[in-house]
């Protein structure tokens, strides 16, 4: 397929730099025919990997943010998108470690479709992100259930860059973005699609086969160990430790609610403004 023009955003932050070499080693093995330009959304750090053309965004450095005053997740995402010059971007994160060959032809078919079809703002490429509700005229694409709480997701997805920028609010975390961004998307009447859940199934057939996800809550997800061992990737797992699911105490739940209150208020007011426009 010719003249496929898109960018790939690997969203990250500098404290996840231990993921970068493993990520791109697996990338170089499992996506050899990738034609998109790769952007690694670093804060201050530069980065390169042999035989891959990677642009380190260095958003905080470019915007002169002091290291003792961290930018928000959403600010960094916005700055990265603003550096790109393509209409369509593929969104991924630094701990989406590839485990098998990427179906590049399918991705390029969807990019070509998005360039032609004005009513496709996003295509979720996994069955793990949003709820599919009904088939569409587009081959192997379902419409996203816009009544479900999760309308947008930070899993692997193709986006119209301007539509993704419309959803971003500088003060939000990734979790805030998914929750409140889903509400904004409904008001803005964006058109979202997801791959056919009868065709794309985790661990059976995946367009971008990757671990969901390699780091959870800042700690390694245990399936990473086997994947890294298989590919001779050395890692000091003691630095992060391993994620273990534990129920939150009442005190922890209350603390999280209190911390979220200012963002909840700002995002609620923002929704009201969108509704009256």
Regions found by a protein language model. Give the residues of each.
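Membrane-proximal basic amphipathic "stem/tether" segments
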Residues: 2-4, 229-277
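Active-site-proximal specificity loops/subdomain of glycosyltransferases
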Residues: 39-85
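Conserved donor-nucleotide/metal-binding helix-loop-beta segment in metal-dependent transferases, i.e.
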Residues: 101-131
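N-proximal low-complexity "stem/linker" segments adjacent to membrane-targeting elements
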Residues: 1-22
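Short, acidic, metal-binding catalytic loop of nucleotide-sugar glycosyltransferases
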Residues: 25-36
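The conserved acidic donor/metal-binding loop of glycosyltransferases
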Residues: 95-97
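Catalytic core and acceptor-binding pocket of nucleotide-sugar-dependent glycosyltransferases
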Residues: 151-219
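Short aromatic/hydrophobic "clamp" motif used to bind/position activated sugar donors
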Residues: 89
């Amino acid at each position: 397929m010719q003249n496929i023009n898109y960018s790939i955003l690997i969203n990250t932050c500098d404290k996840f730099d231990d993921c970068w070499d493993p990520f791109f080693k697996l990338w170089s093995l499992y996506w050899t025919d990738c034609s998109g330009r790769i952007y690694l959304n670093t804060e201050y750090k530069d980065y390169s990997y042999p035989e891959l053309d990677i642009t380190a965004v260095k958003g905080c450095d470019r915007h002169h943010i002091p290291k003792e005053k961290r930018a928000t997740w959403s600010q960094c995402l916005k700055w990265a998108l603003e550096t790109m010059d393509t209409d369509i971007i593929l969104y991924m994160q630094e701990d989406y470690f590839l485990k098998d060959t990427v179906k590049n032809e399918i991705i390029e078919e969807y990019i070509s479709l998005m360039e032609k079809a004005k009513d496709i703002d996003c295509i979720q490429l996994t069955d793990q992100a949003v709820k599919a509700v009904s088939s569409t005229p587009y081959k192997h694409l379902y419409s996203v259930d816009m009544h479900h709480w999760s309308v947008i997701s930070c899993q692997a997805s193709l986006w119209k860059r301007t539509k993704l920028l419309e959803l971003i609010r500088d003060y939000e975390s990734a979790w805030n973005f998914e929750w409140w961004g889903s509400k904004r998307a409904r008001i803005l009447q964006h058109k979202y699609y997801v791959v056919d859940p009868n065709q794309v199934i985790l661990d059976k057939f995946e367009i971008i086969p990757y671990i969901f996800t390699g780091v959870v809550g800042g700690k390694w997800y245990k399936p990473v160990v086997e994947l890294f061992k298989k590919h001779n990737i050395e890692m000091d797992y003691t630095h992060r430790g391993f994620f273990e699911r534990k129920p939150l105490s009442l005190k922890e739940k209350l603390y999280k609610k209190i911390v979220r209150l200012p963002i909840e208020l700002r995002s609620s007011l923002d929704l009201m403004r969108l509704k009256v426009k």
